[in-house]
Amino acid sequence: MVSENDFEELSKMIQETCRISFENSYPNKWIEYTISRQTIERLKDKANKLHFYVAKEGCEIVGCGAIGDYYGKKDESCLFSFFVKPNMQGKGVGKEIMNKLEKDNYFVRAKKVYVPSSIPAVPFYKKMGYDFKDGKMIFEDGSFLLEKIK
């Protein structure tokens, strides 16, 4: 779980990941807007409302993910803030985080679990058993909503 001492490093890791991972998929304006929302304060707020996990290699944060209710529904949950540092992608970090999230009580009790996804993350989520909600839901910001029905 995330600790009070993690938030500054976590914010920087997420911002770096967005800048690098999204550069070939989204306009710079969208990337900068997304980065501007990854503040220490917002991450602390999420950590107070969700179960928020971090993956570390030694003392360095290399990934994160959170899970909570989907709009207050007890039988539906949602993954949030799922990021893996670019130089650690493809090395099992995302799978490790997903395994933690899928053992969490929010996941265990849910019949459906949703995950909003960026374009580059879709193949990972599909590999983990998630598929597009209602065929292929695309939001105005160019993101997708995937789901896993249990």
Locate predicted features.
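Conserved GNAT-fold acetyl-CoA-binding loop/helix
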Residues: 15-41
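A short beta-loop-alpha structural element at the N-terminal edge
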Residues: 1-12
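A conserved beta-turn-beta hairpin within the catalytic core of GNAT-like acetyltransferases
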Residues: 69-80, 89, 108, 139-142
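Conserved catalytic-core motifs of GNAT/GCN5-like acyltransferases
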Residues: 114-116, 126, 131-147
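Conserved beta-strand in the GNAT
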Residues: 54, 60-69, 78, 83
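Conserved GNAT acetyl-CoA-binding A-motif
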Residues: 98, 105-118
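Conserved acetyl-CoA-binding loop-helix of GNAT-fold acetyltransferases
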Residues: 84, 90-103, 127
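A short helix-loop-beta-strand connector motif used in the catalytic cores of GNAT acetyltransferases and
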Residues: 38-54, 78
